[in-house]
Amino acid sequence: MIELDLPLDPGDLFHLCLSVGDVEVAKARLGATRAWVWAPVEDWTLDVFLPGGDVAPMEASVTYSVHGPLHVELTQFRAGPLPAGDDLVEPHHLGYWSADVEATTRSLIARGWSLEYQVGAVGGQPIAAMVRSPAGYRAELVPTTSRPRVEAWLARG
């Protein structure tokens, strides 16, 4: 049996991602039961760096619920190493702020986690990293330097 290992600070948790087949359909489905307010949908094309050195393009449409403190992220993966979602049932990952994505990733790997991919790099730091726990859940590490951009995006909702 794999022990539950929660080395990330719950205070750094800021979103729950649902992988969806269509962002607009998912927004409508969620809006039918609650008064959700969404940030504008952004279309992203990013280079994803896989373990072993391979690079793959990833295309996604992304939005966040505006109201927190825990935001819901809807992501439609259109191309890349991640499968497209088709429902709102299973979370794709939990998103955490990280002061040092690279160091946090190394620390988690030392605890038995695995790196699924990293996204880009700014000044030597990854823009984000997706890691998987020994128990099987994913966590996305997002640098705290991205927080002002994300908060400005949410304010446009």
Residue positions per predicted region:
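Core segments of cupin and vicinal oxygen chelate
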Residues: L8-P10, S19-G68, A103-Q125, A155-G157
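Vicinal oxygen chelate
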Residues: M1-D9, E73, G85, A110-G157
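Short coil/turn motifs at helix boundaries and re-entrant loops, enriched in small/polar
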Residues: F14-V23, D87-E102, G136-E140
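A short, acidic/glycine-rich surface segment
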Residues: I2, L46-P51, G80-P83, V150
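A generic structured-segment signal
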Residues: H71-Q76, H92, E102-T105
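Helix-adjacent hinge/juxtasegments
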Residues: S61-L88
